[in-house]
Swiss-Prot record:
Organism of this sequence: Leishmania major
Keyword field: Cytoplasm, Fatty acid biosynthesis, Fatty acid metabolism, Lipid biosynthesis, Lipid metabolism, NADP, Nucleotide-binding, Oxidoreductase, Prostaglandin biosynthesis, Prostaglandin metabolism
Pfam families with a match to the protein in the record: Aldo_ket_red (PF00248)
Role summary: Catalyzes the NADP-dependent formation of prostaglandin F2-alpha from prostaglandin H2. Also has aldo/ketoreductase activity toward the synthetic substrates 9,10-phenanthrenequinone and p-nitrobenzaldehyde.
Enzyme Commission code: 1.1.1.-
GO biological process: prostaglandin biosynthetic process
Residues with site note (Lowers pKa of active site Tyr): 79
Positions with a binding annotation for NADP(+): 24-25, 49, 149-150, 171, 197-202, 240-242, 246-250
Gene name per UniProt: P100/11E
Protein name listed in UniProt: 9,11-endoperoxide prostaglandin H2 reductase
Length: 284
């Protein structure tokens, strides 16, 4: 799709990160995920987002190799799962993910959630121990950028109070019903890029009459309107699909621009509603 490979954001360390990517949450390991990654890369995507807990890192790597797109042209994100938080366990988990992906380095490594069943260690919050390991991986150039996922402002403040390397990305649930305005403002002030997971509200927003009406103005679907809204908000966005037609359709958003009134109408849909768990309450 024209333009999808050109849309970039610049992280605080100068690394260019593709603004639009493919998420593979709930994509089953094997041929399904491998094909989805291959189709996305062949359609111009240059950013794939996975995680250790998705159990499909090997399939992502296989899809990358099958696509024929050079490794250096693809931005790969993966994430540390909660049970592996802690300094030494983080280092080991990173290496396991790297080997499963079959790559020499990872572009972006994220702490998946700030809490789990065992949030505390002797030294304090486990995600702070993990962040020290993230900084070590970054200094050793095993990863090009480091960040967090599902962090509220108070979680970020904990990290910022102790870090020597500031998180470059915060990936959170973000869509028109939960636009995270306060968190986005905080992250902007700290030069932390915000990335939207579940940008389509797990598909529940696709029948919204306001979004559908806006789409009709531009001859676009409600999904394309939402994703274009993400782009115009300078958000990184990673819609998920395993269907070739939908993968291509999702990326067909770089040939139009939402008018200011339409952006305001989408902004006004916010009700701070979540489809996923609140990070302060999640117990995985």
């Amino acid at each position: 799709m024209a333009g999808v490979d050109k849309a970039m954001v610049t992280l605080s360390n100068g690394v260019k990160m593709p603004q639009f990517g493919l998420g593979v949450w709930q994509s089953p390991a094997g041929e399904v995920t491998e094909n989805a990654v291959k189709w996305a890369l062949c359609a111009g995507y240059r950013h794939i987002d996975t995680a250790a807990i998705y159990k499909n890192e090997e399939s992502v790597g296989a899809g990358l190799r099958a696509s024929g797109v050079p490794r250096e042209d693809v931005f790969i994100t993966t994430k540390l799962w909660n049970t592996e938080q802690g300094y030494e366990s983080t280092l080991a988990a990173f290496e396991e993910s790297r080997q499963k992906l079959g790559v020499d380095y990872i572009d972006l490594y994220l702490i998946h959630w700030p809490r789990g069943k065992d949030i505390l260690s002797k030294e304090g919050k486990k995600y702070l121990d993990s962040w020290r390991a993230f900084e070590q991986l970054y200094k050793e150039k095993k990863v090009r950028a480091i960040g967090v996922s599902n962090f509220h402002i108070h979680h970020l403040e904990d990290v910022l109070a102790m870090c020597t390397v500031t998180p470059m990305v915060n990936q959170v649930e973000l869509h028109p019903l939960n636009n995270q305005a306060d968190l986005r403002a905080f992250c902007d002030a700290k030069q932390i890029k915000v990335e939207a997971w579940s940008p389509l509200g797990q598909g529940k927003l696709l029948s919204n009459p306001i979004l559908s009406a806006i789409g009709a103005k531009y001859n676009k679907t409600a999904a394309q309107v939402i994703l274009r809204w993400n782009i115009q908000k300078n958000l990184i966005t990673i819609p998920k699909s395993v269907h070739r037609e939908r993968i291509e359709e999702n990326a067909d958003i770089f040939d139009f621009e939402l008018g200011a009134e339409d952006v305001m109408s989408i902004d006004a849909l916010n009700t701070n509603s979540r489809y996923g768990p609140d990070p302060d309450e999640a117990q995985f």
